[in-house]
Amino acid sequence: MISFDSAVSRFTSLIFVIVFSLSELSASTNIILLVTDDQRWDATGFMQQRMPSLGRTARFPWMEGNTPNLDRLSLEGIHFDNGYGVYSLCSPARATMLTGQYPHKHGITNNQTDFPSDVVTYANLLQAAGYTTGYFGKWHMGTQDERPGFDYVRTFYGQGKYFGTVFNDENGNPVGANA
């Protein structure tokens, strides 16, 4: 059985290999990591179409054709079939996605702790490989203005709200119609 530290070490090494191998790709290669909040793994038209090939019955057949942009991105890009959250709380899960580390390593174990600016994110590695990076949407890790590793930012503090959300840029300045 692989030890916990060995598994984390292997995962982190894999991330570094993937990111640094990206420098060999052409300048026109785009990387878009799209993450939705509280969405089932099979709640897109793309996955409903794939269900029979997975030996499963489509649970939401009405979804087919209702998520055309997500479906196209899935068909034209890489789709990870076995991605799992390691923490069922927004901020720790998001920090884990950004770093490849478990919450006890990166230090975010609740929704109020600011993201440590000295922790390396995949965005830092992409910047080192010559990529321009951006983060758009819910940050929800404390209230700090800094978004380590991202050149362009449009986020809001905390959980956000349904109407009148004020977005902030990479310097923490309000932007947009509700600024």
What are these regions (language model features)?
Residues 12-23:
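Bacterial N-terminal signal peptides
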Residues 1, 24-25:
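Long, low-complexity, tandem-repeat intrinsically disordered regions
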